Swiss-Prot record:
The gene is gmk. This is Guanylate kinase. It catalyses: GMP + ATP = GDP + ADP. Its main location: cytoplasm. It comes from Bartonella henselae (strain ATCC 49882 / DSM 28221 / CCUG 30454 / Houston 1). Belongs to the guanylate kinase family. It comes from the Bacteria.
Length: 222
């Protein structure tokens, strides 16, 4: 059982480290959105909600899954350098506002990104010390196709495009820090949680360590 004191100590330590960007990426249908939802249940990660110009699906809520905007508005923000990353995917634009990311990281909170390879590459280039990336693979192409059809929210043309782009996405697997084959959902969640927890205690992120250790060394024992 976690005590009140332990919670307070954890909060103080969190405020003395910079947050990082925890990226989940995968071909469409490999499971990154489902995995993201399960990870967010712990309350340790804050979801980065992207802006997009694509049409809202029946199951989606504006402001919860995405911020849905027009192409004209997206291009205005893009040209004003408001995005820390943006990409054109399946003919639509997706992007993350720079200001929202910096506001969260400065408080020691970590952000979860559900983005494609294009967005991942931009974040890795612009914030190399602040990114941890995980690539999710399907167990087979047959299973990937099955998942896309079970979702039943895209036309046949869109499904064909997603399958074509999936093979391109998978060619970039070496660009990620970690790679997981999502055959068993519970096992995949467990692996990703382990990766996340290990990354939170990396020495270079924990600003509190140096004064804490200096205090330990200087501490007098009666």
């Amino acid at each position: 059982m976690v005590t009140f004191f332990e919670n307070e100590l954890s909060a103080k330590k969190r405020n003395q480290r910079r947050g990082f960007l925890f990226i989940l990426s995968s071909p469409s249908g490999a499971g990154k959105s489902t995995l993201s939802r399960l990870l967010l249940k712990d309350g340790k990660l804050e979801l980065s909600i992207s802006m997009t110009t694509r049409q809202k699906r029946p199951s989606e809520v504006d402001g919860l899954h995405y911020h849905f905007i027009s192409k004209k508005e997206f291009k205005r923000k893009r040209d004003g350098n408001e995005f820390i990353e943006w990409a054109e995917v399946h003919g639509n634009y997706y992007g993350t506002l720079r200001e929202s990311v910096e506001n969260v990281l400065s408080t020691g909170r970590d952000m979860l990104f559900d983005i494609d390879y294009q967005g991942t590459k931009q974040l890795q280039k612009k914030m190399p010390g602040d990114t941890v990336s995980v690539f999710i693979l399907p167990p087979s192409m047959k299973e990937l196709i099955s998942r896309l059809y079970r979702r039943a929210e895209d036309s046949q043309d869109i499904i064909n495009l997603r399958l074509k782009n999936a093979r391109t996405e998978m060619q970039h697997w070496r660009s990620y820090d970690y790679v997981i084959i999502n055959e068993n959902l519970n096992q995949s969640v467990s692996l990703i949680k382990s990766i996340y927890l290990a990354e939170t205690v990396k020495r270079e992120r924990c600003f509190f360590l140096e004064p804490f250790i200096n205090g330990l060394i200087a501490e007098k024992i009666d």
